[in-house]
A protein has these predicted regions:
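Condensing-enzyme catalytic core of the thiolase-fold
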Residues: 1-167
């Protein structure tokens, strides 16, 4: 069988009582699990060109997830607008308990096909997200997945369920 991707690192935690509410994670819990996955994979955030986010388009959850990603990425440098931020939910809707694996499959297929699909229906970023002053970009057009196999890392797949990360 052909191997399309390898999970290099994993981070797991449970933010329990620190959650914003039952349906929204805590910023610190999200940042910790992203940091754990990067450390486990032994890669720098700056080497990652694509993040498959949980991205439910909620007014509370997305800003928390974005702030956690930004907090972690900014520890590695101040480079701006180089990492594509996307979510499979714009393509297929929320798949409930299969949402994490759907995002992971999208990330693997993106790597395999060399294309990052555009975020369909994206028009405006949430007012609580400062995209311009961040490492991230959101695109509504397909983009080539440009990577160098000699880089430390070239993809990050994020399940977003219960503070789980895979690199």
């Amino acid at each position: 069988d052909f191997i399309w991707a390898v999970i290099k690192g994993v981070g797991l935690n449970n933010d329990g009582a620190d959650k914003m509410n039952y349906m929204a994670p805590s910023l610190e819990g999200q940042a910790q699990v992203i940091s754990q996955a990067l450390a486990d994979a032994d890669v720098s955030a700056e080497s990652i060109s694509y993040v498959e986010a949980h991205g439910t388009a909620t007014p509370v959850g997305d800003p928390i997830e974005f702030a956690a990603l930004k907090k972690v990425y900014e520890r590695y440098g101040d480079k701006k607008n180089y990492c594509v931020l996307s979510s499979v939910k714009s393509n297929i809707g929320h798949a409930n308990s299969a949402a994490g694996i759907a995002g992971f499959i999208k990330a693997v297929l993106s790597l395999h096909k060399g294309i990052i699909p555009g975020t369909v229906h994206f028009k405006n970023v949430n007012a609580n997200i400062d995209l311009k002053n961040s490492p991230f970009i959101i695109t509504n057009e397909n983009r080539p997945f440009v990577y160098n196999m000699t880089q430390e890392n070239n993809d990050k797949a994020k399940s977003g369920e219960n503070n789980t990360e895979e690199l």
